[in-house]
């Protein structure tokens, strides 16, 4: 094959603007410099051995061939029961729930099944980096609005809020899909009941559908509850709900999640899903179905991660980083612009590179979650780590 073919008009790129992600770059840099990786969002502690045993038992029971395209009955029923118990919405496990190869596949498949060339899709930045490429592959047009960056008396970003005026202007007759993410990555911001009601008012007389990315649903802190799109009956009737077993049960490498949606929407979703991945790992589905029977495994997560958040925040308070609120998810954003070092004037990407190579702690620039980087001096740490890992990272960060 001609090596120049990939660069020629005969083989045009479907995603010409997409390069290597910042997550890959920072993880590689962390490995090269033996830095503590608090950049990419994955745990460094093991999952529950009971879950491993459940998957092992499924393998020994010969659950090793193709499962149903939509996922095994037992797991879909477990998901339906969980959503009903937590959020009060009844999804039919036969027609309204599909097991996916992770949340990202669920997101892409949902977009591909409903977005046609020329359709507009509204996203709220900073945003998970899979949204735009999926929209591009569907031929849609991304319409991005930015979270409002609230600033303190010194002009530093101190929190984020939903940009309702911009969101109102962005939704029109061409809008096919609105993507929301709660709890939010990277900021940890959460949508409230009043926010969902306001969103319902915006889309009520439109043909816009909703994609609600809720992969951090079990990581909401300080006694608050996750407000799912499923808890709002009107919005649930036009929404894809996306979640992730990998995030919930500390098994991100398994790449398994689920999507729930009304029957008409799920029918179209499954048409794409069957040719996108066809189906998902069989023994892991059986293991998760068994593990899901005990709700304590996810009901205990808020306290589990809040303890890690509090430990990490307490350590960061011994530095000159300004801590932003972290009400949910397993991320902590900080502002570095008041550090008493020359590097405090660097761009977010350059600061993260310096932090990794010179201090030995990897982080992610929040600017990377925008198509056009917005510099606000804010970076993201992941605290889904062993206490020893966090302690070692804090020891290094406290030298700043």
Describe each model-derived feature in a short phrase.
Residues 1-12, 16-19, 28-33, 40-58, ...:
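PLP-dependent class I/II
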Residues 38, 62-65, 78-85:
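Glycine-rich loop-to-alpha-helix module at the N-terminal edge of alpha/beta enzyme cores
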Residues 66-67, 299:
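Short, surface-exposed loop/turn segments at secondary-structure junctions
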Residues 70-71:
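Short beta-strand to alpha-helix junction loop
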Residues 75-79, 102:
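Conserved AMP-binding/adenylate-forming core of the ANL superfamily
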